[in-house]
């Protein structure tokens, strides 16, 4: 099965899908106390139509940010190309693969697959389907919530170890 993998931390690879990472601190970026309130039912940052245009641009998802009990969202919009390096991508399976420190959630187009989109634990690799059959020109929003842990005594900061957009041919 031929595979093409783009490292979404590399500018050259992000350009192939017209992507740019944005970083929004907090569970609900821009809200008082970063949106941390008792019994919150959801956060709009997970939704595809959420406006992240005022968030800072993040050119290095591997850079550790913050300290202590922290939440942040990493979001990227990608547009699937017809080909990469001469290889046609139509009908390929498309996956987003990542590893975050410590807990995370992966939302694709405003939805989460609770079986594959919840990251529990440091150094755990995760892979979620973006699209079963690639359609050139289709746009997808990938939103990753990252949380530092353990929650009662967090150490270090938050970051994404890697983020890959993979295209796997059916042939």
Q: Would you name each region that the model predicts?
A:
Residues 1-47, 55-57, 134-171:
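An acidic-aromatic loop/edge-strand motif
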Residues 102-105, 114, 149-152:
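Flexible loop/turn segments at secondary-structure boundaries
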Residues 107-128:
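Solvent-exposed beta-strand/loop surfaces of large extracellular or lumenal domains
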Residues 61-68, 75-77, 85, 115-118, ...:
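Beta-strand-rich interaction surfaces with strong enrichment in secreted/lumenal proteins
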Residues 47, 55, 70, 78, ...:
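Aromatic-lined ligand-binding clefts that engage carbohydrates, nucleic acids, or primary amines
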Residues 82, 100-102, 120, 132-134, ...:
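Short, flexible loop/turn elements at secondary-structure junctions
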Residues 69, 89, 121-123, 134-137:
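Surface-exposed coil/turn segments at beta-strand junctions on protein surfaces, enriched
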Residues 48, 52-67:
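Surface-exposed, low-complexity/disordered Ser/Thr/Gly/Pro/Asn-rich loops and linkers
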